[in-house]
Amino acid sequence: MQRRQSSKHSKRPLQVHHSNQTDLSAWRKGGTVDTEKSAQNRQSLSDQKNDNEQDSLEQALSYFEKIQDRVSLKKSEVLQKHLSTMESIALKRGLPPEGFDVLLDVALSGKLADTVNTRLLKSLIPASAIPESSIVSSVSWFCVSKCSSNIQLLFLRWLITMFDFIDHKEQVHALYGIFFSFLNDEKLCPYICHVLYLLTRKENVKPFRVRRLLDLQSKMGMQPHLQALLSLYKLFCPELVSITLPQKMKTYFKNADGPWKAAINAVRQRNQANSTVPQPLLLGTAQPHSRKRKWNTQLIVPASSANAQNLVVGGKMSRADSYSANESFPVEQLRTFPQLLQNIHRLEFPSQMGSVLTNPLLLHYMNCSKDESVYLRLYYWMGQTLQEECTWCVVDNNQYEEEFRGFLETVYKAECFLQEGFPSCEEFLYRSLPLWDGVSCRSQILQLVSWIPLSTFSEMKSQLCDPLAQLFFTSSLYFKCSVLESLKELLQNWLNWHVVQLDSESDSQFSSLNTTLSGLVNGVAELINFVGRISTAALHLEKSHTFLLYFILDFYETVCDIYLKYKLPLLIMPPAGVFYPALLSMDSVNLNQLCYIMYRYRTNLIAAKENEMSKKKIQQFKFSSQTYQEYNQYIIAMVGCLWTSSAFQKDNHPEGIRLDDELLKKTGVREYKNSFNIVYHPALMCYAVDFLQQAWPDDTTFNFNLIKGKKWNWYLRYLYGQGLEGLKLFIESSINRVSKASQSKAEDEDEKV
């Protein structure tokens, strides 16, 4: 009644006197008032419509609650009216929590025909949350089998779909044994297994249950739903499940959300279109929730009904009064890190596991938790959501691309926070990349690629590298650069994981580390070789584009320091198809970057050689002589180009730039031998011109032959002063004369000090 009174008062027009409004300002003011009045009238009509719908909903619920005898749908106009009302309101705005007790009891009690019960179950769309008590009550009706098997099946599908909307689950977990007893029903078995998969905790795994599942498997064969439950049992208690099960994650259960997903989407769309309309229908004290897409709703930590009694409106309550020592601390009240530390033993994860992704404190807690069921719940929910919401894997999902992009961004941020990838994301990428167009959610997909966990490269090659390479070769330059950036981050994440593992491993576990290290070395080597192959091809396709070359060299800047920086016994040189385009690049940034990379290769190889010669450490892995040979070939080519002007004569690499003098003379270039030294090199010629202008301001001939002898050394110092640090490090480390000169200079400075 209060709502109706308020709506009546809101209909009163503003009292504005128009008799004296003769000037323009008064006329404008009157127009503004008319606009406000019109908006207020529309709001009043909306409130009145909302009140009428709420009255209709209350009448419908009251009718269904009082049904005692079987009523025919065709003969009862009242039933038809209230059923239609219930369906229209549910599909439009969702049902309040208090409505589920009534409707579930009616649908499962068998008082009405299956046609009516089916329509009731399909209209059970929550506006906020589903009370746990209504689930317990409905399971009791489910057990007495008053309804048909088809209704039982539909109820299980509804329960699976709405599982994360249940406000609290302790009493539902207590029903584990009851659900388990229905496994013998072949029709219900797949869905019962699905419910059990969602409910299973370690304490639920018992020997008699394992035996029951094994017996069912021997009768029915290797059914996916039975494998799912057995895999979960084996994870919790490996000593109880001795059979071998498929290790690779797969889709164990069929999609059960049928009619409800479409209804949830419809509710979300209408509420977004009518954002100024009052909140969803509320009965009692239920709190309003925005009806977004199912996964989006789950990103908000829900307030559980079990903890609602602890909340005080308009006042404060001490923690000592609010929570006893054995009482769980509601996660929706978790605000600070000290709170997390004080209550970490009393925290309980929310029913909607998706909310963990957006809460840093819960992510911290998840990182500390040893409860495997927590990870399984999150991985299962995430895997299902990614599969169902993927805009290029599911028909008619293109309209939700912006939301899906936001969801992928949320998942990626959670992975960055935890510093590890989610297995469900890896599985999603392996399935979706062959269908991906390289455009939809490009940035987010490539970000997720960078967090794929380390696995055998044979699996990655067919499921990740092959589809990614197809897109790589057929897409734009900028897509190629994005892929290379993603693969560089993937390599860095693998290497960082290795460093963390080294720090955490003790000496006594070195033997077990060797197996892991061998797998890591092989996986990293395969990834580097893969990037080398696609980079070589990309440079041919893009005509050695400077922008592309920068990203390729950026990748090898990580590769060249693997041994010293990441403590991994591996060094792989870039292929000739990358090295020579960088050496002959027109851009000084790329040339400087290559010089720095070769300097770091030298530093790492010298350190590796010293460790091999030293008897203090037993080398489990040794670099092949081919690595040293390839490095030496590249050094000869670089020094021949940049310093001795003899690259065309001394380069001995099979894919190098060695050419006969007769062929070079035919080019018509006079100083072809000097074409790529530090004076004539296309990437450095602009520096040579500037140096000549500063050294000989009156000379306009730009005679590069003047840069020799002492002028050569002056020019070298000039280059160092231009920020070409990579060039400086390379020349001083790889050229004897300059190296000795720099050493003697350093010694002189030390003596002066």
From Swiss-Prot:
One of the Pfam families matching this protein, by short name: CENP-I
Annotated spans, Disordered: 1-54
Protein location: Nucleus; Chromosome, Centromere
Skewed-composition ranges (Basic residues): 1-15
Cystines in this chain: none
Main location per the UniProt record: nucleus
GO biological process, one term: CENP-A containing chromatin assembly
Job description of the protein: Component of the CENPA-HI complex, a centromeric complex involved in assembly of kinetochore proteins, mitotic progression and chromosome segregation. Required for the localization of CENPC but not CENPA to the centromere. It however may be involved in incorporation of newly synthesized CENPA into centromeres via its interaction with the CENPA-NAC complex.
Family (UniProt): Belongs to the CENP-I/CTF3 family.
Assembly description: Component of the CENPA-HI complex, at least composed of CENPH, CENPI, CENPK, CENPL, CENPM, CENPO and CENPP.
Name of the protein described by the UniProt record: Centromere protein I
